[in-house]
């Protein structure tokens, strides 16, 4: 009898272990496209071959000029068919997932064609992929809620002369409490995810959800947190602590950005703030954030020391002149700051890829209005050593915000949300920072007037101009501008006004 009970207990433990393994497999998976074998990378991520997920296409392996992880040196390409799909990728039904595809062309076909094509996530959320060099790692990423226990990732030929391909597919399970602004039928198509002041990109293991945060280290006032630890629970999206240890702080600047793929797209922006200094009783940092004339978050931003708050804005349509401004309150003694930012296009409806392969070879087709479009950022290889946080230049739909939510305000055409941790300031320490009541305006991606180099993985053309927020457009000193052509994290001055 005792042996029978022990056998039953062992069987139960075995079944529980199997269930945990199955749940883990449904949560996170890394597919090495074009490979039939598995391997473990330097950051202890397990990569599996792609033969269980795709039945079409051909494989290629090449030796790149630069050093790349093994998973980026193989790929699968699709010389025939209008749409080719990876299917039966396991996920948790109804749970939020992040799906990332990466592309390293490497001139595998020796044609120097620089492929362009679309990727469609789960038959709904579409993004246009543009490769620009042999050695540039291009990526696309979407956050959405799967309706079933498996998803598809499809590659759609947009030009008959261009062959779609893919190097890796990564699926990461997100906590249900994250990205509460995401509606059940929507997708967030990543445009930018930036850690201001960071020296290197940040991802797993420093971000347990394996989001990739690009560094932005430029000639701005760069602050490093003196907090022993930073509580990240005050922000719904759970930014990793390491990106909250650096920030930009600046005044009297405004930037506008043409980074989003085209005017008319609807987007979601979320910004993270953490006070780096233990403020004295005579010090205060408080400000509002505006995208054009729409407030980001419905509450005043008072960054908490040793904690984090987030402010977000969604359902805003991108216009030709898009700028982000941080406006200090009259009683603020310190400049506004920013730690990190995420920017997404909101996908509301499907693309053309429905999880099945199409044999048409005619090509053509345009991106779905609900999806994103444009050239994704370049991120290179793995995370390597811990990202540096010191020195250098500066860097709802439905649902509430993290911490103490400010609710919503739809009167300005966008949905606002802010979360704030109002911990009392430690008056024992005083900052050497100068008193200032001023405005900080940053590009959604990167830039400051003295910027000559850039590490935020942005692209497109950025411009800045000095602009007091409340001045009418006719008074903007547009001659004081500088255009930066951004590619692969480097900036080149192409035009400067007087």
Curated annotation (Swiss-Prot):
Side Cytoplasmic, residues: 463-498
Domain of life (superkingdom): Eukaryota
Principal location: membrane
Pfam families: Malectin_like (PF12819)
Glycosylated position list: 44, 150, 354, 357
A Gene Ontology cellular-component term: membrane
Residue stretches of biased makeup (Basic and acidic residues): 418-436
TM stretches of this protein: 442-462
Region of interest (Disordered), residue spans: 351-439
Signal sequence region: 1-26
InterPro entries xrefs: Malectin-like_Carb-bd_dom (IPR024788)
Keywords: Glycoprotein, Membrane, Signal, Transmembrane, Transmembrane helix
Subcellular location: Membrane
Topology in membrane: Single-pass type I membrane protein
Bias-annotated ranges (Gly residues): 362-414
Record topology, Extracellular segments: 27-441
Protein name: Uncharacterized protein At1g24485
Protein species of origin: Arabidopsis thaliana (Mouse-ear cress)
Gene: RWK1
